[in-house]
Amino acid sequence: QDKIWQQGSWAGLHDWQAVMPQHYETAKRMLGVSQNKKVGNADLMLQKMANLSGVGDSFYLTDVGAYFSEHDKYAHPSVHGDPYFGGAGPKRSPCIGCGGCMVGCRYGAKNTLDKNYLYFAQKNGATLLAETKVTDIVPIADASKSPSDPAYQNGSQGYRVTLQSADKGEYQITTQQIVLSASSLGSQKLLFEQRHKGNMPHISPYLGKRIYTNAESLLCVRFLDEQHGAMSDGVAIGSGIYLGDGTHIEATRYPEGFNIASFLATLSNYKNGKKMS
């Protein structure tokens, strides 16, 4: 929504409404975004709930990074099995609506980064280190300067990075520059650790403030009869609605046989409008 650009720490820094659409368009093209074409029972149930709540006109089908057919907005007739990049990308298969998007697509339909951005990065010379965790980042000291000089260890000489690999164990690499992109929590955790260890003592005291995350809650609903059909059919998040107070609700599902996930939740029971447990 446009009003988001007038909120938060980025408000007023740029004409975001004019600048950002082109970048969103690039990301959508690379990720093969398309409107959900696998409408399942959970989506229909959400639409029914929206109608009963008086917000039926807010119901919509989500835009998702999945391949349905060559008629998707950013897809084309396949070349060597690749419907997006003229044969330069990996082979893909259409979505079958199994609901397994969030636990790993088994059919090559989900447009994960290893099928676009990372695929081409590696194809053009980048090295990808899978199952590897960064544990330390230490600026390399400038031997020509005194340890009391602020520029002695300010990163201008590069960094020594300690990695923990599942197969190689611990080892180090050096690099001139670093871009941290481990999402809101992962990047901050690593930076807090480096400041605490004294590796990067000049990290801003504003680290950890004004954080933005998904701010969502997963609420499970169980239907005790079978008249509604399987609720696992479709894509992981296939539709959504908005309530009058701005609350956003989406129909989310996991694949059939994923019942074990219910042990991660607690039971809630409402009586006369009050939460009992």
Ranges and model annotations:
Residues S9-K133:
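Conserved redox-cofactor binding core of oxidoreductases
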Residues P77-K91, A143-Q153, G273-S277:
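Low-complexity, polar-biased intrinsically disordered regions enriched in Pro/Ser/Thr/Gly
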Residues Q1-K3, G104, G229:
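Short, solvent-exposed loop/turn elements at domain surfaces
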Residues L13-W16, Y107, K115, K123, ...:
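Glycine-rich loop(s) and the adjacent beta-strand/alpha-helix scaffold that form part
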Residues D2-Q6, H71-K73, P139, K189-Q194:
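Short, solvent-exposed loop/turn and secondary-structure capping segments
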Residues Q1-G8, K123-N124, Q157:
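Short intrinsically disordered, low-complexity coil segments enriched in acidic
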Residues Q6-G8, P21, E25, N36, ...:
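C-terminal segments that line or cap access tunnels to active or ligand-binding sites in enzymes
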